[in-house]
Curated annotation (Swiss-Prot):
Sites where the protein binds ATP: G30, L31, N32, G33, S34, G35, K36, T37
One of the record's GO molecular function terms: ATP binding
Listed name of the protein: DNA replication and repair protein RecF
Compartments, as annotated in UniProt: Cytoplasm
Cellular component terms (Gene Ontology): cytoplasm
Protein's gene: recF
Protein family per UniProt: Belongs to the RecF family.
An example Gene Ontology biological process: double-strand break repair
UniProt keyword list: ATP-binding, Cytoplasm, DNA damage, DNA repair, DNA replication, DNA-binding, Nucleotide-binding, SOS response
Main location class: cytoplasm
InterPro entries: DNA-binding_RecF (IPR001238), DNA-binding_RecF_CS (IPR018078), P-loop_NTPase (IPR027417), RecF/RecN/SMC_N (IPR003395), RecF_2 (IPR042174)
Protein source organism: Cellvibrio japonicus (strain Ueda107)
Pfam families referenced in this protein's UniProt entry, alphabetically: SMC_N
Length: 365
């Protein structure tokens, strides 16, 4: 799986870009503010319909333009070429296409281009809210279990209706029972999907971590979001009065968590900044490995400002793992030589260089 061509129009300071990346290593250099991160951002938007820098769509559209357009030609692992594209205007209206036909949702587009991002925000995986870690888990579940996303969407709809019902002055017991039954079924299915994926993920991560950083006593704990000793139906019944008082469903798979601890304590509170970065890199690489093992496909890695995020020794470890995964990578940095340094001991790899200056992308000889 690789991105064979990328065309970007009117995204931030990228007015018009048309490149043909290498199927392996792509190194993007340029001064801060030149647009190199925006190039990675364009790939992420093409893959997921959203930016890794902002949840708002308007800042993505170039000044005085009506919309941005991103087109990609994906080379699948079976050598088939799949054209995909996204356009979003100032009003937020979006047009999605794959293989020349309109696509109904971002989820339908996302299956064509699985990407992993490693940047400064990635380290929120440890420090951020449980939602960040749920999203991390669910990336893998989404890509390996195709029934997950429809079930997840149904769960969100069910929670919305149940919470609305809880806020009424008078609650119809039959209506509550109907929503509770559906919620129980969906919640248990979502939990099953996550539990199965984490059972695959954890041993791969634990083995991989030793090559990044030795952290004796580090553990991952998948927590399903309600008392593991109780059936979810019983939990809903027991917590009804509190849920009604506060107008929200407290327990369930929407409150699941991936706890990362060191000797029983929150790892984010104990580890140094450098150790945290290495831990997160191991999490991201392990996720790509499990994805490949289960699906037989490979994901694309977008690594922003690598020289600034890791010291030379640990930067080399990440580069070595990206090399071993035999997948497509896009890595940005300010200095050309600093980016190239990690690949000098790999003569069979010839990185493709891209220089970004004032939103213009060139491919120097």
């Amino acid at each position: 799986m690789s991105l064979a061509r990328l065309r970007v129009h009117h995204l931030r300071n990228l007015e018009s870009v048309d490149i043909e990346p290498s199927s392996r290593v792509n190194l993007i250099y340029g001064l801060n503010g030149s647009g190199k991160t925006s190039l990675l951002e364009a790939i992420n938007v093409l893959a997921l319909g959203r930016s890794f820098r902002s949840h708002k769509h308007k800042p993505l559209i170039s000044h005085q333009q009506l919309a941005f357009t991103i087109f990609g030609r994906v080379l699948a692992d079976d050598a088939a070429e799949i054209p995909i594209g996204i356009q979003r205007n100032q009003q937020g209206e979006v047009m999605l296409k794959a293989n020349g036909a309109n696509v109904g949702s971002i989820a339908d587009l996302a299956i064509f281009l699985p990407v992993q991002v490693i940047n400064s925000d990635t380290f929120l995986l440890l420090e951020g809210s449980p939602k960040v870690r749920r999203q991390f888990m669910d990336w893998l579940v989404f890509h390996v279990e195709h029934q997950f996303y429809p079930q997840w969407k149904s769960l969100q709809r069910c929670l919305k209706h149940r919470n609305s019902l809880l806020r009424r002055d008078r609650i119809d017991p039959f209506e509550l029972s109907t929503w509770d039954q559906e919620l129980v079924q969906l919640t248990e299915q979502i939990h099953c999907f996550r539990e199965q994926c984490m059972a695959l993920f954890v041993p791969v991560f634990e083995q991989l971590l030793q090559e990044f950083v030795v952290l004796e006593g580090l553990e991952l704990h998948y927590q399903r979001g309600w008392d593991k000793h109780k059936d979810y139906a019983q939990v809903l019944q027991d917590s009804f009065e509190r849920d009604k008082r506060l107008g929200v469903t407290h327990a369930g798979s929407h409150r699941a968590e991936l706890r990362i601890t060191l000797n029983g304590q929150d790892a984010a509170e104990i580890l140094s900044r450098g150790q945290q970065k290495l831990l997160v890199c191991a999490l991201k690489i392990a996720q790509g490995l499990v994805f490949s093992q289960v699906t037989g496909r490979k994901c694309i890695y977008l690594v922003d400002d690598l020289p600034a995020e890791l010291d030379e020794q640990h930067r080399q470890r990440l580069v070595d793992w990206l090399y071993r995964m035999d997948t497509q990578v896009f890595i940005t940095g300010v200095e050309r030589q600093a980016l190239l340094a990690g690949w000098l001991d790999k003569p069979e790899i010839t990185p493709k260089m891209f220089h970004v200056e004032h939103g213009r992308v060139s491919c120097p000889a």
